[in-house]
Amino acid sequence: MNRAWRWFACFTVVVLAAGMLLTDGAKAAEDKVAFYANITAVEPIMEAFTAATGIKGEYTRISTAKFLSTVFTEFEAGKLMADVIQAPLPVLEMLKDKGVISDYVSPEAAAYPEWANKNGIQLFGIEYVGLIYNKELVKPEDVPKRYQDLADPKWKDKIVMANPASHATTIGWLIGLKEHVFASEEEWRDFLKGLAANNPMLVASFGPTPAPIESGEKQIGISMPKYIVTKAPAPLDWARVENQPLMGTPRAMGISTKAPHPEAAKKFMDYWLSKGAMSLLAAKVGEYVLTPGVFPPIDGMDNAQVIPIRELSDDEIATWGEEFKKIFAIQ
């Protein structure tokens, strides 16, 4: 009997030890979170998250143009390392349709507008686009008062913008002008022809747009006002177009269905959506967020009208990309 009890006691100790090792391993496995995103300059949020939770945030930036193919290729190969994924809403919805995004709804979502949650895809901001310019080179009286002013010949060879044949966000923004700003398609097309005639410098995405404006190589661009914050003290300002909105694609995020660190992923998403993190995102990164009462520290932005533009289908993006390629004579 004593021998049997000794065997039982040894077995119990082994089981408990194994359980402790498994628990410690699980804890170790949740000490980091991988974040794939197209948003830039979010290091302050990553650092604040790590300081608040002890979980290391690993940020991988992927351009919008390569986002869908990169994430889905990794997902299909069983090599997706992302726990949390952030991208423009249309990209997240396509990933959701392919089974990449889970149904997790953060408790922080309750503070957002009802329309900002789409079955596990959480909208938290708008990738707002406008006209930014070099305030040392552009006289106050020359700053555009309407989007239409960008077609004025005085801006010839002085504009920079993302390639309208290939940059999906710019394609969507130009269509947004047609649907929200111009009175007719004819007026909109005249604007496009005038803009193209001004021979804008075309770059791959919004990321490279502020540099030539800052340096004085160009004076104005179709870009993101957030760069006024992230590029400070560069001499950048934004054109306060009269009775016309700033527009952009909704920024969205979700948790991967194959997240290597699912619990850490939930903590990260909860933290990201908190008012504290959104305030930091606005203040340090210049983002326009959907948290009520929180605005980026850009003069006049608290009074700006900022609206989301509709999602374009893949076919629409391809069709309009080809159309803009012709209008802008892109080789």
Regions found by a protein language model. Give the residues of each.
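Extracytoplasmic ligand-binding site segments that recognize negatively charged/polar headgroups
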Residues: 32-44, 62-66, 72, 80-217
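Extracellular/periplasmic bilobal clamshell ligand-binding domains
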Residues: 297-331
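A bilobed periplasmic-binding-protein/Venus flytrap-type ligand-binding module shared by bacterial periplasmic
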Residues: 130-137, 175-178, 249-261, 280-284
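Short alpha-helix C-terminal cap/hinge motif
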Residues: 44-58
